[in-house]
Amino acid sequence: RASLIVGGEARFKMIQALKEGLPYEEMALTENPDNYVKAKEDLYVAEELDALGMMAVGYYAIIESAMRYKNQYSLKEHENFLGNFYERFSQIASKNPHAWNQKIYTAEEIKTPSNKNQRIAYPYNKLHNTSWNVNQASALILTSDEIADKLKIPFNKRVYPLVSSETNHMIGVIQRPDLTSPVGLKLATKYLIETAEKHNIKPTFYELYSCFPVAVQLFSEALNIPENIDKTITGGMPFAGGPLNNYMLHATAQMLMRIRENNSEVGLITGVSGMMTKQALAIWGKNPAMDFESKDVTKEAEKLELPVPMSKLSSGEGKVIGCTALYEKNMPSKAVFYAEDSQGHRLVLTSTMSEIIKQVEAEECVGLKINFSNNRFVSLG
């Protein structure tokens, strides 16, 4: 009749213990959960994994470059945009008593690489990334009005889930027909907004998943949120903290606390899994204006968004559809290009040449021609 949902992240404790040479033990997982969910597909294809590894930042940086090209920003304009965008997140986090980092960072600090803000994958620096080195936890209790009444829980402590949607359609980033427009996200957003509008429900607060700036942008675009509306109430994952595998619960708990303070407020929360692979959205309100409705749009998305085949050409010419420059220990290590060959199929190319890495950070490479031979990068432009 009631459920307790609990989650947390203690990675900061682990890191401090390792730094100080102290023992750190995690509770052993000796029992399987009642229901275990495992994806049928992998998050990435082999070519992506070889070029970018398992860390998410490179994949999101590639998507960010495609978004930059779509919005016709110059590289400098884009760097300024990202700095200003997350400066506002930092300001909001500074006023959040639950934020992990309440320091206010300026746009200049965020966009400029430094020893404390190392570049990781262009255009992303450390302050563009989610911060998972935190000690944070949250919990929710879900129950019915009937049980709440029996327990004499006052109405002012109750918040209601109104509508939610999700997509679990999985395609590796390189095989997505449009890197900046996931079909599942469009379908899930359409259902959520149309269902809410039928009941005259309009969100007043947003908490858009903010593992990296492009995730916020994609949700904001899909939801058609005006530029002057804040996209977070917490301050976002780089500043409020991004407890690994638990941020959705953390954001929801804070949203419900905010809604409790004002009966007229309605909160919209979004979530992501993988490399902008799966998306979920939910609307909560103080007033139970509708019976809860939910939809999984996965099957519809699978029919509409088919993976683009990987290239079988070993040599030829293609067009860059996304790119980044990866860093290791604050030094550039390689440029990574997602490209489309002459047959419209996809390939991943890399270069460790310093002039190519510099070019990725000096001029727009998305849209340029790229030449390859024996499955290796030859030239750009």
Give residue ranges: language-model regions.
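Conserved "HGTGT" condensation-loop signature of ketosynthase/thiolase-family condensing enzymes
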Residues: 2-134, 138-147, 153-240, 257, ...
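Oxidoreductase and adenylate-handling cofactor-binding alpha/beta cores
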Residues: 253-260
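Cysteine-clustered segments with highest specificity for TGF-beta superfamily mature ligands
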Residues: 267-269
